[in-house]
Amino acid sequence: MIAANHVYSVAKPDGLTLGMLSYGIYLDQLVGRKEVQYDVRKFNWIGSPERSDVLLYMRSDSPYKSLEDIRKATTPPKCGSTGTAGTDYILARLLEDTLNLKIETVLGYPGGSEIDLAVEKGEVQCRGLTAAPFFGREPFISWRKKNFVNVLVYGGLKRDSRIPDTPTIYEIFDKEKTPEESRRVADVILRGGDFGRPWVAPPGTPKEQVKILRDAYAKAMADPALVDEAKKGKMEVEPVSGEELQKLADKMIGQPPGVIERVKKLLGK
């Protein structure tokens, strides 16, 4: 947020200063945090190297093979979390809010690695996180080879080819005829992943410079050497254009009051 405030209010709009922001930066504005000194709709969005959709993994030896199993269970699964601001915590609350599930969240782990270790030890059974680390690093690479965990739900708009049997939350919404307001709440929380790791220029940056920056960024993301290096590091390059990010920022902020109030409650604001 400090970086966003600086780029918005302090940095000169000359095309020489850019900021890489948190993908969830719009949420602070949406729920009305007093520290916010920016309007995400007025940034000049340049581009993002990836989307950051979330997923929920569960130990394969647990009795929970689907979200429906969680709903029917008399004892809810235990999911680890770093705290109430973490992706793991927010995803669990979203599933409870929109799909009438119960998930027991164990708070206080210092970081994701400690949660994963707790899963291995059997202290907890599940964790929510973004897809990039799940597909790109240990222990997940080994876990997937050993079928140690299953992914129960994916937060993207379409299924991920690496987990083709895992439904998206939107498929489940369609199946269960989830009300429109609940879908909007999910969109506000989950579609932040479409921002990925976005670059922005200050408001007031000349349009011709914004175009130069967007074009240069798009060319860089398509550079074969960069794509090859990313593959070596088991990283996905799925660039999002500045124009698409601009539209997304407008959509995320333009929510009806009922949705905003539910998002505030979900985030504990």
Where are these regions (language model features)?
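Short helices/loops that flank or line small-molecule/ion binding pockets
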Residues: 1-13, 93-94, 98, 113-127, ...
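Hinge/capping helix and adjacent helix->loop/strand transition within the periplasmic-binding protein
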Residues: 6-17, 25, 29-121, 173-184, ...
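Paired acidic/hydrophobic, glycine-rich loop segments that form the ligand-binding mouth/hinge
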Residues: 14-21, 78-80, 124-134, 151-152
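Glycine-rich beta-alpha junction loops
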Residues: 23-24, 108-112, 131-134, 155-159
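Short beta-strand->loop
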Residues: 38-49, 102-108, 139-192, 241, ...
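Residue-level detector of anion-binding/catalytic polar loops
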Residues: 102, 125, 236
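An extracytoplasmic/periplasmic, membrane-proximal ligand-sensing/linker region
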Residues: 145-151, 174-175, 204-269
